[in-house]
Amino acid sequence: MAVISMKQLLEAGVHFGHQTRRWNPKMAKYIFTERNGIHVIDLQQTVKYADQAYDFMRDAAANDAVVLFVGTKKQAADAVAEEAVRSGQYFINHRWLGGTLTNWGTIQKRIARLKEIKRMEEDGTFEVLPKKEVALLNKQRARLEKFLGGIEDMPRIPDVMYVVDPHKEQIAVKEAKKLGIPVVAMVDTNTDPDDIDVIIPANDDAIRAVKLITAKLADAIIEGRQGEDAVAVEAEFAALETQADSIEEIVEVVEGDNA
């Protein structure tokens, strides 16, 4: 059984590609047709490649892989952060800083500075510093958190990188390739698929499409780490949360189901 159904893909608008004049000819084999000047992605292939991506991510996670989620455009930022956190992984959802992977030592120093500023606030150092200095430190922390907060606790260079829109994230993809890090990516009709190790032909501009694919890959990581049952349990709780706004109401729903 496919991890994502054709119906889910259609409802999320995964099939809508870019304008035909903006296409990359290397994506021709993943295109079903053209309609009103827009390429339509072949969802039968998306189903197949999504299955392959799921298996790849699940197996990597089962071997304790560190996964970095990357998506810096507004349509991807929220989903990338939410699903990385949900699956216990790491993310970059604002501008990619050149050298994030290839100059990891320097990035680690910036992360150490971020942690130092946080400690200063927690241990009371801020209380004895001049207000002007505290304001500057807070400004520095905010900037560091914006760009590095999602990888603050990443223990090492990632073993796998998941990318939403590799056309936009070309620098990130190049750094990953240079270091031999496999890249899993949503690939739209305007993108060169050759640099991607595990592709998912998909509309990477629609929020619902990005959320659907990204959430499914997060599920793969959870399954790889905790087993298939963990994904089912999490889905059950997610369904409960749509019915209840408080812990008390969730308990009532659960007890009602068991009555």
Curated annotation (Swiss-Prot):
PROSITE patterns: RIBOSOMAL_S2_1
Coiled coil: none
GO MF, any single term: structural constituent of ribosome
Annotated protein name in UniProt: Small ribosomal subunit protein uS2
GO cellular component, one term: cytosolic small ribosomal subunit
Classification of source organism: Bacteria, Bacillati, Bacillota, Bacilli, Lactobacillales
PANTHER family listed in its UniProt record: 30S RIBOSOMAL PROTEIN S2 PROKARYOTIC AND ORGANELLAR, SMALL RIBOSOMAL SUBUNIT PROTEIN US2M
Biological process according to GO: translation
Record flagged with keyword Ribonucleoprotein: yes
